[in-house]
Amino acid sequence: MNGILLIIASLFLPSAVFAGENSGVGATSPLDLTHHIVGYLSILFTVLAYVAAMSEEVIELRKSKPMVLGSAIIWFAICIYYALNGQAKVAALAFESNLLAYIELLLFILVSMTYLNAMEERGIFDGLRIWLLNKQFSYRQLFWITGFLAFVLSTVVSGLAVGLLMGAVATAVGKNKTKFIGIACVNIVVAVNAGGTFSPLGGISTLFVWQHKILKFGEFFALALPCLVNFLVPAIIMHFFVPKDTPAASSRAINLRRGSKRILLLFAVTLVITVWGNVYLELPPAAGMMAGLALLQFFSFYLTQTVKNQESQFAYAYKFFGVDVPVGNEKQDFDIYKNVGNVEWDTLLFFYGAMMIIGALSFVGYLDAIAQFLYGQNHPTNANIIIGLSSAFIDNGTLMFAVLNMHPDLPPGQWLLLTLTLGVGGSLLAIGSAPGVGLLGQIKEGYTFGYHMRWMPVILLGYIASIATHFWINAEYF
C-alpha cells in the first residue's frame, strides 16, 4: 500500500517522496507543512477555488463546484503525505473533526430552509407582500416597514430568504420608482445583516460562535443595541432621499393555504426547543432543529391524510370548457420532501467546501501563523475590526470559521466585537453578504453594485457607530 501511495504522491506531490520518515514528530502531532509543497498546493487550490466561486456570475459555474473539488484535492494531498509518514490516522481524525462541524451546520440550516420553503409553499410570504400593498403605505413608510421587518425576521430566518422576500416587496411597490427600489434594497441588506448578527438562529457567523460554545445564547443579545444602531444610522440618512408619494394598491386577494398558520407555530416551537436544548441540556443546536423537522414531517402526514377534495359540484364544467379549477377548490396536498429537496443545496455545498478548506489550512499550520500576525502583533480590537472590514468581499461565515480555527485567546467582549464586525461588515459592499448577492441577481433595475457603493460612506458610518456603541454599553465583557 505504501508503494502505491508513493507512486501517486510522486505524480503530483514530488517533494513528498523525499520527506524524511524520521521527522521526530509524534504519532498524534500534526506536521508543520507551511513551507512544504503540500502547503503551497493547499494555498494554490484555495485561491483557485475562491476565485472561481467569486466569478460565479461571469463563468456561469455554481459556486459550490470549485469549492468542493478544491477541498477534496487539498485533503487528499494532506492525507497521502501523512500516510507516507505513517500517520494516516492523524490526518483522518482531523478530517472527521471538520466534517462533524459541517454536519452540525448542515442539519441546522437544512431544517431552517425546509421550514422557509414550507411557508412559501403555503403562501405566507406572498400574503405578506399583498397585505403591505393593500395598506396604501407611502414609499417612506414602506422604506421603514421593510427595513424593520428585515431586521426582526433575520434574527430567526435565513438572511438570504429575508432579503429576497423584502426585495420582492420593494420591487412590487416600486415598479415605476427605480429610485425607491435601489435605496430600499440597500436598506434591506443593511437591516438583514444587522438583525442576523445578534442572533445565532439567524446569522451564520454568530451560529458558528454559538456552536463552538465560546459564548452562551443569551450573551449575544448584548449586541442587540449596537446592531440596531448599525441599521438606524444609515437608514435615517437615506430616509431623506426616499420619494414621498404613495404606490397603487394591489388588486390581488390574500390566499393562505391550509396549515400555513400551524406551520408558523411549529417553526416557533422548533426554535424554542433548539434554544432550550442547548441552554439546559447542552445539546448541539442541530438536535433541536431535527426535532422540529420531525414535527413538520408528522404535520405533513396529517395534512395529506386529512385533506378533502374541495372540487365544487361544477368540476365537470371546468373540465369540459378547459378552465382551471379556482384557487381554493383544488386538492391541497403537502409533501415535506419537496420542501427538503428545494433548499439551497448550492449554498450548503459551498459551505462544505469552504469549511473543509479552512480546516485543511488550519491543519497544515497557516492559520496559526495568521493568528500570530493578527493577534500577536496587533491589539485584538484592531484585528477584529480589520477582519470585519474584510467581510465586505469575503463570506463572513468562512472568515469566522477561519478565526475559530486560529484559537485566539480573547475575552468575551472581543468575541462579541468580532461577531459584530463580521456580521455587519458584509453590508459595506453588495457582494459582501448573501442578501446583497441575492438581490443583485433578483432585482433587474434600480439596485446594482455601483448603486450600493454610492451609499457605502453612510453604511461605514453605521459600522463605526455600532462598534462605538458596543464598547460603550458592553464594557463589562472586556
Regions found by a protein language model. Name each.
Residues 9-14, 42-55, 70-80, 109-117, ...:
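Hydrophobic core segments of alpha-helical transmembrane domains in multi-pass membrane transport
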Residues 43-114, 127-135, 286, 290-356, ...:
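Hydrophobic transmembrane alpha-helices of multi-pass solute/ion transporters
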Residues 87-179, 341-409:
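Membrane-embedded alpha-helical segments and adjacent helix-loop junctions characteristic
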